[in-house]
Amino acid sequence: CAVSFAPITNLTGLINTMERNEGFKVYEDYLRSDDWTFDQASPLENIDKINVPILLLHGDRDLNSPIIQSRSFYNKMDKAGKNIKYKIFKDGDHFLSNEEHRIEFLKEVEKFLKQYL
């Protein structure tokens, strides 16, 4: 099983939405320097290879990892009939700054791990 909080599941999608600055160019050049592509490294494009239950959690106000990353992944996994549970933290940020969110996160993870381990 796997637990993922605020994942980047689509590298191409992320790169296309990132601010273009000098640091971005170095990052992009590094990632594109090998034979593999962003798509080959993106979980969103490798759904067929995923064969474990996944718990996916994300805050809907995450400014570091856009929630579309989780939504797209969940939708594609669900459509493929994969075992995935998706939890959105309303008004949640990337750092689980809200204490209630942290407690809820830990409870969800504990419940999921007890079920699959």
List each language-model region with its residue ranges:
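Active-site-proximal cap/loop segments of hydrolase catalytic domains
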Residues: 1-117
